[in-house]
Amino acid sequence: MTIERTFSIVKPNAVAKNAIGSIYARFESAGFTLVAAKMLRLSREQAEGFYAEHKGKPFFDGLVEFMMSGPIMVQVLEGENAVQRNRDIMGATNPANALAGTLRADYADSFTANAVHGSDSIESAQREIAYFFSDDEICPRA
């Protein structure tokens, strides 16, 4: 197995529910190590830049508004096959299709307010990590 890093966001609806600690506990119980984390409130420029690949899609404006609606937590998770394992823990993007026990089944409110974001590939993880963290903000713990 390969040790990877993946990027994750706890979205505004999950932060508003005070679910940060519960979500972090799930990450750690699954064997992930948090190597970087911070809370922030996205500006329009940050939200549009982060989701630029979705610009022009029908859900883009609503997603940007939602991501600006409150504080978020951004974090870097490290572990074996981190990208795929985090996606498994999150559950389906549409919470109506998320398996019981996944983060989205437990904390999502809707397709947009689906509690968490996670990178979909190693390449996306690298790009997304670099969007929010400088190299000196990442603290390997092993």
Swiss-Prot record:
PROSITE patterns: NDPK, NDPK_LIKE. ATP binds at K11, F59, R87, T93, R104, N114. One of its GO terms (biological process) is UTP biosynthetic process. Its main location: cytoplasm. It catalyses: a 2'-deoxyribonucleoside 5'-diphosphate + ATP = a 2'-deoxyribonucleoside 5'-triphosphate + ADP; a ribonucleoside 5'-diphosphate + ATP = a ribonucleoside 5'-triphosphate + ADP. Its cofactor is Mg(2+). Its EC number is 2.7.4.6. One of its GO terms (cellular component) is cytoplasm. Pfam families: NDK. Keywords: ATP-binding, Cytoplasm, Kinase, Magnesium, Metal-binding, Nucleotide metabolism, Nucleotide-binding, Phosphoprotein, Transferase. The active site is at H117 (pros-phosphohistidine intermediate). SMART domains: NDK. Belongs to the NDK family. Major role in the synthesis of nucleoside triphosphates other than ATP. The ATP gamma phosphate is transferred to the NDP beta phosphate via a ping-pong mechanism, using a phosphorylated active-site intermediate. PANTHER family: NUCLEOSIDE DIPHOSPHATE KINASE, NUCLEOSIDE DIPHOSPHATE KINASE DDB_G0292928-RELATED. This is Nucleoside diphosphate kinase. It comes from Pectobacterium carotovorum subsp. carotovorum (strain PC1). The gene is ndk.
